[in-house]
């Protein structure tokens, strides 16, 4: 049975043997140097999580592309205002992903996880190069903007924020997103 993305990712993290974990969704692909560049960034900063910039490719219009940059340092507060961390762009310490398993498939479970990790560990590092090619489909979880907005609001509520703080964070997210 399909238990959702969270269960699949968590199972992979549990079965993995290495020190680092990288996720790659089925319709995305990486630059061949992605992992090497991220390992160097993690070694340099001592962070537990690293992400990269990404190039968005629209399924309906493949010639239309958009580049998303990432800052070199990403804090919890910055991440509350907008999710710059694409799941398939992440390289993270396995021990941290075991500590913070993904849950809540009904919201953006990866965004929720990154926020929980940064709340404890402080910062993530970013490699500002589009080392991830990310495909956006209108049928995907993030493709429907209204549905995605509701999932983002639920992330803030899952973090224990009250209604007004959640609405404030969501407004910041919407402006930055």
Model-predicted segments: where are they?
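GHKL-family ATP-binding catalytic core of two-component histidine kinases
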Residues: 17, 31-32, 93
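Conserved donor NDP-sugar-binding/catalytic core segment of glycosyltransferases
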Residues: 33-65
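Non-catalytic, C-terminal membrane-associated alpha-helical segments of glycosyltransferases
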Residues: 124, 138-177
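Short aromatic/hydrophobic "clamp" motif used to bind/position activated sugar donors
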Residues: 21
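Glycine-rich, basic loop-to-helix element that forms the pyrophosphate-binding segment
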Residues: 1-16, 37
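The conserved acidic donor/metal-binding loop of glycosyltransferases
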Residues: 25-29
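Conserved nucleotide-sugar donor-binding catalytic segment
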Residues: 14, 69-147
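Short, high-confidence coil segments that cap the C-terminus of an alpha-helix
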Residues: 18, 45-47, 121-122
């Amino acid at each position: 049975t399909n238990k959702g993305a969270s269960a699949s990712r968590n199972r992979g993290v549990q079965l993995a043997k290495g020190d680092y974990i990288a996720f790659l969704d089925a319709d995305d692909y990486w630059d061949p140097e992605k992992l090497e560049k991220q390992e160097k960034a993690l070694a340099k900063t001592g962070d537990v999580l690293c992400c990269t910039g990404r190039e968005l490719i629209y399924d309906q219009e493949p010639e239309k592309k958009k580049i998303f940059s990432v800052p070199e340092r990403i804090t919890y507060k910055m991440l509350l205002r907008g999710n710059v961390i694409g799941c398939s762009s992440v390289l993270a310490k396995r021990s941290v992903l075991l500590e913070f398993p993904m849950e809540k498939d009904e919201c953006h479970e990866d965004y929720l996880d990154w926020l929980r990790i940064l709340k404890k560990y402080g910062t993530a590092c970013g490699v500002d190069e589009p080392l991830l090619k990310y495909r956006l489909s209108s049928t995907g979880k993030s493709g429907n903007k209204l549905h995605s907005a509701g999932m983002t609001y639920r992330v803030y509520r899952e973090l224990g924020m009250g209604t007004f703080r959640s609405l404030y964070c969501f407004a910041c997210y919407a402006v930055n997103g």
